[in-house]
A protein has these predicted regions:
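Zn2+-dependent metallopeptidase catalytic core
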Residues: 64, 298-326
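Positively charged n-region of N-terminal signal peptides that target proteins for export
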Residues: 1-4
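The catalytic-center signature of Zn2+-dependent metalloproteases
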Residues: 331-350, 436-490
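Bacterial N-terminal signal peptides
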Residues: 7-16
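Sec-exported extracytoplasmic/periplasmic mature domains
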Residues: 312-323, 351, 447-448, 452, ...
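Auxiliary tRNA-acceptor-end handling modules of aminoacyl-tRNA synthetases
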Residues: 24-299, 317, 331-429
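Conserved catalytic/binding loops enriched for acidic/polar residues
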Residues: 428-429, 433, 459-789
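Short pre-active-site segment immediately N-terminal to the catalytic Zn-binding motif
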Residues: 299-303, 424-442
Length: 789
C-alpha cells in the first residue's frame, strides 16, 4: 500500500512539473511577453513597453543581410565640432545570428571577398579575415522561428560616437547619462522595408570646452537625438560599373581573391543611384523609377526656391545621358521624416559659425549603389556671400540708407519678402549674387550624392565646365566699376554631363558596355574634359597649375592680376557706405577682411605654376595612353611670369590699407565682442593692426614659394632642363623683392616692408630647419639666410 502511494505521488509530481514547465514555456512566447505592449509592425516589428521604458525587437530573419545606418537628426550647432543636424554616421551591412538563447548582430567583411559561384572558395576568404560582432542580445521570448530581444541598450548607446567626437575636438570628457536619455517615439516608426528608431541622448561632463560652452545652454549637459535605420538591402537587379580615373565618379574599393591571376585583385566600382530606362532600346526614355530629392521645408524663401532650382539643374545632365524626367526635386511633405532612408534629402542646417556644406550618401558597400543621398547645407553660407558682396560694392549711402531707398536690416533683402527685387540680379546686387551662390551650392552638394567627386580643374575650361569645382565669384570690371552680373553660373557644365553619362548611361540591348564606356571616355578626353581632384589641388605643395580651389579662368596668372585690380577698386570705395545705419563702425573690419584678402585663392592658384607640372590621370588603352598628354613641366617663361605676379603682391603699396579706412575702424564696440564675425589677427589690441593684416596677406605668397615639395621639384626640373628655374633662383627673387629694393620713404609703407622682411626670414628659417625637406633645399635656404646677415 505504501509502495502504491509512493508511485502515485511520483506520478503526480512529474505531471505537475510538466504542467508547470509547459506553462512556463507558454509564458515565454512572444504573444505572452508582448501582451499589453504597443506594437509597431513593419520590416522588423517593434514593441514599446511604456511602463518600463523598453523597446523590444522581433527577429525572424537570421543570417539574412540588411543595412544598418546611424545618423544624427539634431546637432550641437558648432561647425568645428562637426556634430551637425542630419549628419550620417556609419553604414554597415549586417545580419542576425542565433546561438541558443543569444542573438548576435554580425558585420561581415566586404573589403575582402571572392566573387565566384564556388561556395568553398567564398568560405576560404570569409574565414581568412576577421568579422565584427557589433552587439549581443539575450532572447526574451520565442515563437516558431521568431525571437524577441530587448533592444533598449542597443538603441540607447552612443552609436554615433558623440563622446569620441567631443574628445577629439578637445571639448571635454563626456559620458552618456542614461537617467536623462529616452526614446524619441515621434520619430520611431516602422515600414515594410525599413525600421526607424530614434533616441534622445544626454551627455554630461564637468569641464566642457569653449565650443560647447558657446552653443549649449547648459554646457555640462549636451542633448542630441540619434537615429537608427534597419533597412532591407536592394534586390539583385543592380549592375556595378567599374571606376575609371579619367572621370570623377567616386566608388568602393575591395579585394577579389577569385579574380584570375592575370587580373588585378583590387576592384573598384563607382557609386551611383539605380536608374533604368523604361524602354531600354530608346535613345531617350522615361525611367522605371526617377531619382527624387526632397528639400528641407525649414529653409526660408527665397532660399528654398534657390535650393530646388539649383538641384534641378541635374535633370539636364540626365537628359544628356538618355533619361527623360529622371531627376526631380520636391519639397519634403510635412508628415515625412527626413531621416527615413527612402528620402534623398537636402537639409538646411544652422550653426553658430559658418562652415562646410556636405554631400554624403547611404551606400550598399557590396556594390556601390547609392540608397539615399543626404545633403547638408550650412545656412550661414548665404550670409557670407552677402558679406563678400557688400564689402566689394557699397550698397548704402554714407548716411546709412541703401542707395535708392530707406535704411533697412542688412539681410532684409535676403530674408525679406521682396521676391521681385531678389530676381532682378542687377550688376551690383549682393543679395542676388548670394542667392545665385546658393543655387550653385545646392547643385554642387547634390552632385556628390549622385556619386561625383570634386573637379578642381573645371573652372579653367568651357566657361565653368562643372558645378563640382569650388567657384569664386567672377567679379567683372566694366567701365572701371565692379559688376556681379556673371558672379556665378547657371546650370550644369559640359564636364558634369560627361560624368553623369559615364555613371548612368544605359546602352542599347546587346551592346558591349565596356566598349561603349571606353568610347565615351575617349570622346570626353578628346574634348578636353580634364579631371583633377582633391589630392592634387589641396596640399600646400600641389603641382598642377590648373587644379585650384575658389579660382576662375583659364589663365591663373592673368586672373591674379585681375583679382588684384578688383581688390584695388573695392578698397578705393570702401567706407561708411558698406554698412547700414545703426551698425557700429568697428563692424567694418568684418567686411574689410574678405575684401583685403580677395586675391588669396587666385594667388594660391598662380603660385602653382612655379615648379608646376601639368598632368592627367591617363590610362593605357588599345591605342596607347589616354589622354595622350600625360604630363608636362610648366614652361620656364610661364614659371617666371607667375613668380613675378606673385611677388608683386608683396609690394608695400599692394599690402597697405588706406589710412582713411583705418580712421573708420575703432576698437570693438560694447556688446559686439562676440558674434559670427571673422577678424584679422591683432597684436595691437584693442586698436586695429594694419601691420598684422599685411603680414597675413604677405604669408599667402611667401609660404608656398618656400614649400619643401615645390622647392624639390624646382631643383629636379632644373636638372632635367637648365632653362627651368631652380629653387635658389626663386629664393634670390624673393629676397630681391623683400630685402634688396630701396626702403619706402613713407613711414607706414616702410613699417609694412620691415614686417614682410621679418616674415621672409621666418619662413626661410622654417624651411632650413625642416627635417623632411630635401638636403639641397635646406642647403640653398641656409645659404640665402647667411647672405642676409
Amino acid at each position: 500500500m505504501k509502495r502504491s502511494l509512493f508511485v502515485l505521488f511520483v506520478v503526480l509530481l512529474v505531471l505537475s512539473l510538466n504542467t508547470a514547465a509547459a506553462a512556463q514555456e507558454k509564458d515565454r512566447s512572444i504573444r505572452t511577453r508582448t501582451k499589453g505592449l504597443q506594437k509597431l509592425d513593419g520590416y522588423m516589428p517593434l514593441y514599446w513597453d511604456a511602463e518600463n521604458g523598453k523597446l523590444l525587437l522581433e527577429i525572424e530573419r537570421f543570417n539574412a543581410e540588411f543595412l544598418y545606418q546611424v545618423s544624427l537628426p539634431t546637432g550641437v550647432g558648432s561647425n568645428p565640432i562637426g556634430l551637425d543636424r542630419g549628419q550620417l554616421g556609419s553604414t554597415n551591412v549586417v545580419f542576425f545570428e542565433r546561438t541558443g538563447q543569444k542573438v548576435l548582430l554580425v558585420r561581415p567583411n566586404y573589403r575582402y571577398r571572392a566573387i565566384t559561384n564556388d561556395p568553398q572558395e567564398r568560405r576560404a576568404v570569409e574565414e581568412s579575415f576577421a568579422r565584427s560582432v557589433l552587439w549581443g542580445f539575450k532572447v526574451e521570448a520565442s515563437e516558431d522561428a521568431r525571437v524577441l530581444v530587448d533592444a533598449t541598450a542597443f538603441f540607447m548607446r552612443d552609436a554615433h560616437g558623440v563622446v569620441e567626437t567631443l574628445r577629439r575636438a578637445n571639448q571635454g570628457r563626456f559620458q552618456l547619462d542614461e537617467s536623462r536619455s529616452s526614446f524619441y517615439l515621434a520619430r520611431t516608426k516602422n515600414f515594410p522595408q525599413n525600421t526607424e528608431v530614434e533616441t534622445q541622448l544626454t551627455f554630461t561632463g564637468d569641464e566642457p570646452g569653449r565650443l560647447v560652452r558657446e552653443t549649449v545652454p547648459t554646457p555640462q549637459a549636451l542633448t542630441v537625438r540619434q537615429h537608427h535605420s534597419l533597412v532591407a538591402l536592394p534586390d539583385a537587379g543592380y549592375k556595378p560599373r567599374r571606376l575609371d580615373p579619367r572621370v570623377g565618379v567616386m566608388g568602393v574599393e575591395f579585394y577579389d581573391y577569385a579574380s584570375p591571376i592575370t587580373e588585378p585583385i583590387e576592384q573598384r566600382w563607382i557609386n551611383r543611384h539605380r536608374l533604368q530606362k523604361r524602354d531600354p532600346a530608346a535613345a531617350v526614355s522615361e525611367p522605371v523609377k526617377p531619382i527624387i530629392y526632397y528639400v528641407d521645408s525649414g529653409a526660408p524663401e527665397p532660399i528654398r526656391r534657390a535650393l530646388i532650382e539649383g538641384a534641378s539643374w541635374w535633370n539636364e545632365a540626365f537628359e544628356a545621358a538618355g533619361f527623360k524626367n529622371a531627376f526631380q526635386v520636391k519639397l519634403l511633405p510635412p508628415d515625412a521624416d527626413p531621416m527615413d532612408v527612402r528620402y534623398n534629402m537636402i537639409n538646411w542646417v544652422h550653426r553658430s559659425t559658418r562652415g562646410w556644406s556636405y554631400g554624403s550618401s547611404v551606400e550598399d558597400p557590396r556594390t556601390g549603389e547609392i540608397i539615399k543621398g543626404n545633403v547638408t547645407l550650412g545656412s550661414l553660407r548665404v550670409r557670407q556671400d552677402f558679406l563678400l558682396g557688400t564689402g566689394m560694392i557699397p550698397p548704402y549711402t554714407s548716411g546709412g540708407a541703401r542707395h535708392g531707398g530707406d535704411a533697412f536690416c542688412e539681410l532684409g533683402m535676403v530674408f525679406g519678402g521682396d521676391d521681385d527685387y531678389l530676381t532682378q540680379n542687377s550688376s551690383t546686387d549682393a543679395a542676388a549674387m548670394s542667392v545665385a551662390r546658393i543655387r550653385q551650392l545646392s547643385a554642387h552638394e547634390v552632385g556628390h550624392t549622385l556619386g561625383l567627386a570634386h573637379n578642381f580643374a573645371a573652372s579653367t575650361y568651357d566657361g565653368r565646365a562643372s558645378v563640382m569645382d569650388y567657384p569664386a565669384p567672377m567679379v567683372e570690371i566694366k567701365n572701371g566699376k565692379l559688376d556681379f552680373s556673371n558672379a556665378y553660373g547657371r546650370g550644369v557644365g559640359t564636364y558634369d554631363k560627361f560624368a553623369i553619362r559615364y555613371a548612368y548611361a544605359q546602352f542599347a540591348p546587346g551592346a558591349d558596355e565596356a566598349a561603349e564606356l571606353e568610347r565615351l571616355l575617349e570622346d570626353g578626353t578628346a574634348r578636353g574634359m580634364l579631371f583633377i581632384s582633391d589630392a592634387d589641388a589641396r596640399p600646400p605643395g600641389a603641382a598642377h597649375p590648373l587644379a585650384n580651389l575658389w579660382d576662375n579662368g583659364a589663365d591663373p596668372v592673368a586672373m591674379l592680376r585681375h583679382e588684384m585690380e578688383v581688390r584695388r577698386i573695392g578698397l578705393a570705395q570702401f567706407g561708411l557706405a558698406n554698412i547700414p545705419r545703426g551698425t557700429p563702425l568697428s563692424m567694418l573690419e568684418a567686411k574689410l577682411l574678405p575684401l583685403y584678402l580677395h586675391h588669396r585663392y587666385q594667388l594660391q592658384a598662380a603660385v602653382k605654376s612655379v615648379g608646376g607640372l601639368y598632368y592627367t590621370y591617363a590610362v593605357k588603352t588599345g591605342a596607347g595612353a589616354n589622354p595622350a598628354r600625360v604630363q608636362e613641366i610648366v614652361a620656364p617663361a610661364r614659371q617666371r611670369e607667375a613668380l613675378n605676379a606673385v611677388l608683386d603682391t608683396l609690394r608695400p603699396e599692394s599690402l597697405v590699407i588706406p589710412p582713411r579706412i583705418l580712421a573708420l575702424i575703432p576698437p570693438r564696440a560694447f556688446g559686439y565682442e562676440g558674434g559670427t564675425g571673422e577678424y584679422f589677427e591683432n597684436r595691437a589690441d584693442p586698436a586695429f593692426d594694419p601691420i598684422a593684416a599685411a603680414t597675413v596677406a604677405a604669408d599667402i605668397a611667401i609660404l608656398p614659394l618656400v614649400e619643401p615639395h615645390r622647392a624639390a621639384r624646382l631643383n629636379g626640373f632644373h636638372a632635367l632642363n637648365p632653362a627651368n628655374p631652380d629653387f635658389k633662383q626663386i629664393l634670390d627673387a624673393l629676397v630681391g623683392r623683400t630685402w634688396l629694393e630701396p626702403a619706402p620713404r613713407d613711414a607706414y609703407h616702410a613699417a609694412i616692408a620691415r614686417a614682410v622682411q621679418s616674415l621672409t626670414v621666418t619662413r626661410l628659417m622654417d624651411t632650413a630647419a625642416n627635417a623632411d625637406a630635401a638636403p639641397q633645399v635646406r642647403a640653398a635656404t641656409t645659404q640665402t639666410l647667411r647672405a642676409l646677415q
